[in-house]
Amino acid sequence: AKALDKMLKNLSSNEAVLVIRAFTYFLHLINIAEDLALLRVTNVSDGNEDHSPGSLNHMFSRFDREKKQNTEILDVLGKAHISPVLTAHPTEVQRRSVLDAEKKISEILKKRNALRKQENIGDLGDNEDSLKSVIVQLWQTRLLRFSKLDVADEIENVLAFYKSTFLKEIPILYKTIERKLGNQSVASFFRMGNWIGGDRDGNPNVTDQTLDLSVKKHGETIIRYYLLEVHLLGSELSISKKLIGASNQLLELARMAKDPNPHREDEPYRQALIGIYSRLAATLVKLTGAHARSHALPPSIPYNNPGAVSSDLSVVEDSRRANKGERLAGDRL
């Protein structure tokens, strides 16, 4: 202890900063490893009868023991309202560059665990090289910002979490619950909340303009997500009406799309989804002023409400199910 104390006292200012940075990143890496270890334990326990507390499996096992009926659970969920509220505070400490690098490290470590199970020595070596590369990147990345974020920056930062987490995981949550309830539809009980750009706790930088910006940016993020999903769905549903039938509603939706491409004239699902995509793109312009990326689009009428989008997608879904397509693009729909 005395030797360490003496060594630390003899450090120059620059050396002390390096030591502090090293320990900071070391703790970050330890946290990533601990999170992944906990995730592995949870995944293992989910495969056993003794499910880990807090998991959906544990919760539904308890429902079974208490002989809860699906109708009771659906009724409670129909009245429930869970709303995680995002604030700027968690995003002010770390830079986006640091968070992105740490996310990449986490993804590499997840792949590493799978490669170990496969005993794939060659790919393990490549994985280790990738891991070292990102750690070097992290070490050479500035940890702190030189200037404070403004409200617009805070809005952009928090929206990154929607893209990386919420938009992917919330549908999985609903699907898992619905499967456990006999594939019955569950009411929308999980709704995101957000203070950024609209909080009224005395922040002098929050105005009606920042609130308007926040609402538009959130809308743009959600609509762009749907645009991407509809585009991917169109690439998956390459169904020819010469080979399988389609509902009259689906054929009408395809006709209304006015798709000029002759190569898709026998593919009503793609035509219908092009129409849905075009209307979503028009909605994006109307509500946010932003434009959809790429893809030549015919002029379309914007959607007036979310129910109209859902209705069109239901036409695609119902036709798919009625014409031997239950296994087609089920997850995405």
Task: Please give the residue ranges for each predicted region.
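Often metal-dependent polyanion-binding catalytic scaffolds in large enzymes
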Residues: 1-333
